[in-house]
């Protein structure tokens, strides 16, 4: 059993155990659509060259979301084992490719089941906002009045209006609302942490 040491380290450990030159990396809540599966088979038959990315389509509380900044959400998930590694912190992980690695785009969607209920979304926001606040504190960031008051409002308008989240119906509204709440919480918690450090 490998000791948990964060998402990036865990994925790099799994990559090191892979027996083949190319890796397809999927999370537990993801699956390949039939179209994407066919695209991958075609690419394999033609011979792998570089890395491969594809659109990720997210299911939010039972509805597929195509707006609000959540789609196409391109992810690079097929890559040469020797030319890629995961980097990042305990909040996010990012795939880093060697310079010059070509990224090809495949047709079809990577299906992603993210939040199964509004309470699930709220619970994760509470948890991740704490991690974000601690990270911002370590980076020396501040949480002034303008940031705490206006950033959540801008986040809502950005997702619901400018990125057309309203076209996803109630799902789009709740995504924009909880995205704004996530911003409000992380700045509120950062403000509290800063106050505690001054005390």
Report each predicted region and the residues it spans.
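Catalytic-site signature of metal-activated, phosphate-bearing donor transferases
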Residues: 9-16, 21, 33-197
